[in-house]
């Protein structure tokens, strides 16, 4: 399986992740939109990404079931992780260079999406309720 490498904007954090398939998904939930100033666009990853651990790695528990990992220095969004360790990790898709044949596959929390934008791509769409039911406890 292909392993990709990327950095945050200030290059203080180096990240490696195995991306099984370059299928892009995005989350329209309010928390992701505030976190990223847009929908969070990510690749799903079954293995925890390898991150150069240092004082710049920040973790924020955004809910009782998830945390968000970011660079404390430049603010780059790195990834979203369920705290149960069973669900996939969602890695910022734009950290990596050289990923080919990316497809826009899914939109989650579609019922939280504001009316002011739409993506033209045909994707699978999941509501907040469907996402919450899919989380392995």
Swiss-Prot record:
Main location, first listed in the record: cytoplasm
Cofactor: Zn(2+)
Subcellular location: Cytoplasm; Nucleus
GO molecular function, one term: S-(hydroxymethyl)glutathione synthase activity
Record has Manganese as a keyword: no
EC number: 4.-.-.-
Signal sequence, renumbered to the chain: none
Alphabetized UniProt keyword annotations: Cytoplasm, Lyase, Metal-binding, Nucleus, Zinc
Binding site for Zn(2+) 1: 8, 10, 71, 74
Note accompanying the cofactor annotation: Binds 2 Zn(2+) ions per subunit.
Enzyme class: lyase
UniProt-listed GO biological process terms: formaldehyde catabolic process
The family this protein is said to belong to: Belongs to the Gfa family.
Protein name from the UniProt record: Uncharacterized lyase C29B12.13
UniProt source species: Schizosaccharomyces pombe (strain 972 / ATCC 24843)
């Amino acid at each position: 399986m292909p392993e990709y490498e990327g950095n945050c904007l200030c290059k203080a954090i180096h990240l490696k992740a195995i991306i099984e398939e370059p299928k892009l998904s995005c989350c329209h939930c309010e928390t992701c939109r505030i976190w990223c100033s847009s929908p969070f666009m990510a690749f799903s990853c079954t293995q925890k990404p390898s991150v150069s651990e240092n004082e710049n790695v920040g973790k924020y528990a955004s809910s009782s079931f998830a945390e968000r990992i970011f660079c404390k220095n430049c603010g780059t969004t790195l990834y979203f992780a369920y705290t149960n360790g069973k669900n996939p990790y969602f890695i910022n898709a734009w950290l990596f260079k050289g990923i080919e044949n990316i497809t826009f596959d899914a939109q989650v929390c579609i019922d939280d999406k504001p009316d002011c934008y739409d993506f033209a791509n045909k994707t699978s769409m999941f509501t907040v309720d469907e996402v919450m039911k899919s989380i392995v406890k």
